[in-house]
From Swiss-Prot:
The gene is ydhU. It is a multi-pass membrane protein. This is Putative cytochrome YdhU. Gene3D superfamilies: Transmembrane di-heme cytochromes, Chain C. The keyword Transcription does not apply.
Length: 261
């Protein structure tokens, strides 16, 4: 049996391992996660409103540009983003039983292909960081980290409303602030590998099902929970990208590779 058949078989037997989430059935943990996600949107919306009413920064182009994002990094970034969207969409649609059996088969195939492509992207990311100059941005300097993180937190909560300058501007030595660095390291070297691993085990259930018969339930629950956690990161990441001198400035840097001060 090929991997696609394994995936389709596993998906068709999903209800045997974990109930599909329908409007009539939402487990308590999913309700809590949903409330937290909505709460996050409200907090980000309030923060955006306070920023808009605060001191305005000049949007004038100061001509200070630093080339921080190579073509390889930008290609990886946009490929990663597209695959994440496709995987989340196909996975959530299946879990919430939004379509019929015929569409499920197509969504499983999309999910499988995108999963392998995401694995390739992640391996490329690890390779770029291992042999290129991008890796040092992910090495956390532990000495004084708490003080730096506190300073960055204060900026996000108060300083940004007052038009203060960023305490840790992006440079060729460090393109991430302390909070960004920890978040990106956690996602790229923790959350994403776990998502890929649980996804592969879901694709090849016979690898664990015969040895640990009850593990399939927890495998699916874990994979779905990790995917839901990634939603928090994605929304937070997108919002923070709007906190530059202009709302579109950071997005532009991922197009041409230049960070603007």
């Amino acid at each position: 049996m090929n991997p696609s058949q394994h995936a389709e078989q596993f998906q068709s037997q999903l209800a045997n391992y974990v109930p599909q989430f329908t409007p009539e059935f939402w487990p308590v943990w999913l309700i809590i996660a949903g409330v937290l996600l909505v709460g996050m949107w409200l907090v980000l919306g309030l923060h955006a409103l306070l920023r808009a009413r605060g001191v305005k920064k000049s949007a004038t182009d100061h001509g200070e540009k630093i080339y921080l994002y190579s073509k390889a990094v930008r290609l990886w970034h946009w490929s990663n983003a597209l695959l994440f969207v496709l995987l989340l969409a196909s996975g959530l649609i299946n879990h919430f039983a939004m379509v019929g059996a015929t569409a499920v088969k197509s969504l499983v195939a999309v999910h499988e292909v995108c999963g392998f492509l995401l694995l390739a992207c992640w391996l490329g990311f690890v390779l770029i960081n291992a042999v290129g100059d991008n890796g040092h941005h992910y090495r956390i300097r532990r000495q004084g980290w708490l003080e730096r993180a506190a300073k960055q937190t204060r900026f996000y909560l108060f300083g940004i409303m007052q038009g203060e300058e960023h305490p840790f501007p992006a440079t060729t030595q460090s393109k991430f602030n302390p909070l960004q660095q920890v978040a990106y390291v956690g996602v790229m070297y923790g959350l994403l590998p776990l998502l890929l691993l649980t996804g592969l085990l879901c694709l090849y259930p016979q690898a664990v099902g015969d040895v640990f018969p009850g593990v399939r339930y927890w495998l699916l629950q874990t994979h779905f929970a990790l995917a839901f956690i990634s939603l928090f990161f994605i929304f937070g990441h997108l919002y923070l990208c709007t906190t530059g001198r202009t709302p579109h400035e950071t997005f532009k840097s991922m197009v041409d590779g230049y960070h603007r001060h």
